[in-house]
Amino acid sequence: MVIDQVKKDIEEWLINFVEVPHPALGNWAPCPYARRARKLNQYSVRLGDDVERDLFLFAKKQYMGKNDVIIYAYPAKQYDDAYFNFIVDVMNNSKGFKKRNLIALGDHPDTIEEHNGVRFNMGKYALVLLQDKVKLHNHAKLLALKGYYDGWDEEYLQDVFTHRRDPRL
């Protein structure tokens, strides 16, 4: 993988999908904060090497800095989706992630994430999106107050909120 191409592909996904309001989502964008983060250059894309090692070292030695999200990209076939999601789950439960209030959101092309017929996966790479859990919760709370989660499937939302507090409460 070439970093410039990966960055371009992810930026196109953000512009053409993640930031775009969708009728099946109540005319909300899949991530209402993505456009702002992209425009203000508050995200970083990195080529991942080893998902477990990358996340462990991030939790131990690195910081979010000005970024709202740090995205690690891996070739889609480097990991099967079960193992990839298992590692992301293990890291979310790790002492390092809890101590630093980090959350890792996995996106593997073979794990279909769909709501109301809208498929959320990036599709080309296996991604780990790292965010500050407190900041994410505060943004999600504001969205909940505005009705963002109204009409979403409860089972899907429970999966989304697995490693964080439900902002609707």
Sequence positions of predicted segments:
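Expand to "…catalyze enediolate/carbanion chemistry for C-C bond making/breaking, isomerization
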Residues: M1-L169
